[in-house]
Amino acid sequence: MNKIALYCRPGFEKECAAEITDKAGQKEIYGFARVKDNSGYVLFECYQHEDADRLIREIPFRELIFARQMLVVGELLRDLPPEDRVSPIVGMLHGVIERAGDLRVEVPDTNESKELLKFCRKFTVPLRNAMRQEKILQIRENTKRPVIHVFFIAPGCCYVGYSYSHNNSPFYMGIPRLKFPSDAPSRSTLKLEEAFHVFIPYDEWEERLASGLYAVDLGACPGGWTYQLVKRSMMVHAVDNGPMSQSLMDTGQVRHHKVDGFKFEPLVKNIYWLVCDMVEKPAKVTQLMADWLVNGWCREAIFNLKLPMKKRYEEVAHNLQKMNLQLKENGINAQIQAKHLYHDREEITVHVRRIWSAYAASRNND
């Protein structure tokens, strides 16, 4: 198996391909990307047979922006016989993987492929049983073992492979399943909720998304992102010249500042979260977020960057690199993560967590 399959949003295959090619090159692993527009996935074929496994071990999945999932796959299985689709799939895995912890039968996130989902759910049962009999799959689900993926791109045609549970997306098809809350003021609320699921480990939610934390929402109107903070019992400074949802104001947890988000400066020093979803040039938003972090006005930030029409990956990488450099120059140690979320469209979501000042003298102030 010398290929990597990466799931992505349809229409962003070129960005996903540019990113994996760049990341592989940094590891001195070479190959070429196969891209089919609007297919919802990319294949990266390595020149050396063992390099595919090395890539999915060594490239941190959390550092990939446009990939929803990353796995090693073999050659495409075509025209699976309707009377026995199981045997060819199981045969692909003999000698490749044993005692895997989970099985996911998946499809690309396209309208055409969604018709296959019903089949995938039914097919999972006999396939799982066969894999357990062959000891390819453990009897019980084990989150510490590799995950087997069977990726159907058309009826009777699939890629078979695996990912590592410590370096993949834990979600089926790489997509968190979230429901739109009926009392939220806008659908944008799902972007921030998904960001929490993707960027913050569940065992840290009680600390980092705790009741009573103070937050600032820049460009808050009508309150989709503020809603997520209020739902977690935070106190929110909502900054926007436009009107806020009355139901949010009625909670008593929101203070509305009718100010331009680029001009607002907090008067208090107890802000933990900064969130921002403003329609503005990526460089301008990135600079604003860097200023907040350098000034010590927040501990963590989640913000959206609107994507340009061309060279999206290059533009995003440039802005994040510039931000990272600015933080380091100011003695700030931070973790930066970015993801093209399921609920994002022509944008990506970035998470920055300030750890502490790199300068010991400044740490006491953090």
Swiss-Prot record:
It is found in: Cytoplasm. It is an enzyme of class 2 (transferase). Its EC number is 2.1.1.186. It catalyses: cytidine(2498) in 23S rRNA + S-adenosyl-L-methionine = 2'-O-methylcytidine(2498) in 23S rRNA + S-adenosyl-L-homocysteine + H(+). GO terms for cellular component: cytoplasm. Its main location: cytoplasm. GO terms for biological process: methylation; rRNA processing. The keyword Cell inner membrane does not apply. One of its GO terms (molecular function) is S-adenosylmethionine-dependent methyltransferase activity. Keywords: Cytoplasm, Methyltransferase, rRNA processing, S-adenosyl-L-methionine, Transferase. Catalyzes the 2'-O-methylation at nucleotide C2498 in 23S rRNA. Belongs to the class I-like SAM-binding methyltransferase superfamily. RNA methyltransferase RlmE family. RlmM subfamily. Monomer. HAMAP family: 23SrRNA_methyltr_M (MF_01551). This is Ribosomal RNA large subunit methyltransferase M.
